[in-house]
């Protein structure tokens, strides 16, 4: 029988999931091996499979997306700090090479960055759900315009009174950069204290 009472159930930083099988010792060993293999894949290649707090990403996607995923979180966190009013909509534009990536993971990174200011407990999986529960519309647009950058992400937050935007790219050195804030062109490397 599944446990119905446990002190862990009351901790805010613990997520309990149902037991979905593994009724025999052999099945439990197989599940343990599968979890160990998935953790090994993540640590060695960046691949994420069946995680509760992050969208699934293949090893191939992880190699290319790593810096972009980091950038998406920085963009969200920075624009979240710029926004004091209730958010009505989050519009995310993907341009160039980034538009061909796993946009679900990048969307989650942006929204989690924005939502963490008001709710530090959100993660990449829960943030879009929390945003929708608050009535925030999330939209994405892909375009393939050739310009100065091989690819970039632009995030626009819409409130009752105004729109604010920020854009960023990943340079050839693999480092994320902010390239535009509120329509002003810049070149700034995001720091932990900034985002």
Identify the function of each model-found stretch.
Residues 54-195:
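A conserved regulatory-domain signal marking ACT and ACT-like small-molecule sensing domains
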